[in-house]
């Protein structure tokens, strides 16, 4: 039998030629982390969370905990480096089970954060 699971993270897409990772992390008062680079546009994952909660909002709050209150800084960095932000939500929903599936709708505080930071919501779900 399949198990429910979910992954959430904040994704930053950037161009390596114009992006200063050290400035980005220092501006947000986050520890600089080594990250993998792929393709022309590169990406950073922040707040990766795989600890399942039936309410996806709780998982997202863990993902965004170090970014809440820094919306203006994120927006300024977005403009400075021409960044793209995504909130990635990747749940696995189990078909034909008596257990409830994950609540996927976002609550107002998270929607407000996405709006203020011009972050796109990316929901990729798998049905098992």
Regions found by a protein language model. Give the residues of each.
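Acidic (Asp/Glu-rich) sequence patches and key acidic residues
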Residues: 1-126
